[in-house]
Amino acid sequence: MERSEKLLSRENSVLVIVDIQDVFLKPIKVRDFTVENIQLLAQAAQRLQIPVLATTQNAEKLGALAPEVAEAIDDAPVVDKLCFSCLASEPFAQHLQATGRSQVVLVGVEAHICVLQTALDMLKAGYAVHVPYDAVASRLKRDWKYALLRLSHSGVMVSAVESVVYEWLYEAGTDSFREVLPLLKAREQARQEAEESDEEEESEEVETPPTEDANEEAEEATESPPTSETGSEE
């Protein structure tokens, strides 16, 4: 059976990690969540022999790649740039072309600036671009939301981290599946433990009537991919 061209394949994919630097990560509320998802993708890519490229923005002044991501990508190329679109950097464009891959899984920060500009330039250059919503972030949730809406409307495939990994794997029962499955199980276990911890903290708090501020904070804390309906609410 011929697979849909809208699905990723490990033979055609490259993972691009954009500007995961502490200076950009610190103001982001979902920093740990985003970085952990990027680590998972990087580790899965390494095990599946999928090329990985990373960028930094003006590293001399803004700092190097965050240590946890630098460790996850091992010796993959890291290209420093000043332009916001990665593809506008000639060294990066050369590295990307050298991979020979046509599908780009694009992750990093910020969703509405460097990720967005890079994705749209890659589309124009003929790449199929996939952006997992849970591996990109912005300082403000509304910026993240509208970036993903704009990308989706422009032809980018907005996806999820697990979707990406399972599309790479294609089927169960293989050596590749057995090699990557522990990463997925560890991620699920960590998420369950985090949820249980949150529930315990909530149960210890004194119940008070909700306020408008509390409702707004709860909404901001909820991470879900944007839709046209959610976009119209803002």
What are the functions of these language-model segments?
Residues D22-P27:
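Short acidic, Gly/Ser-rich segments with clustered Asp/Glu that frequently serve as metal-coordination loops
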Residues E2-V14, E60-E234:
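Active-site-adjacent betaalpha module
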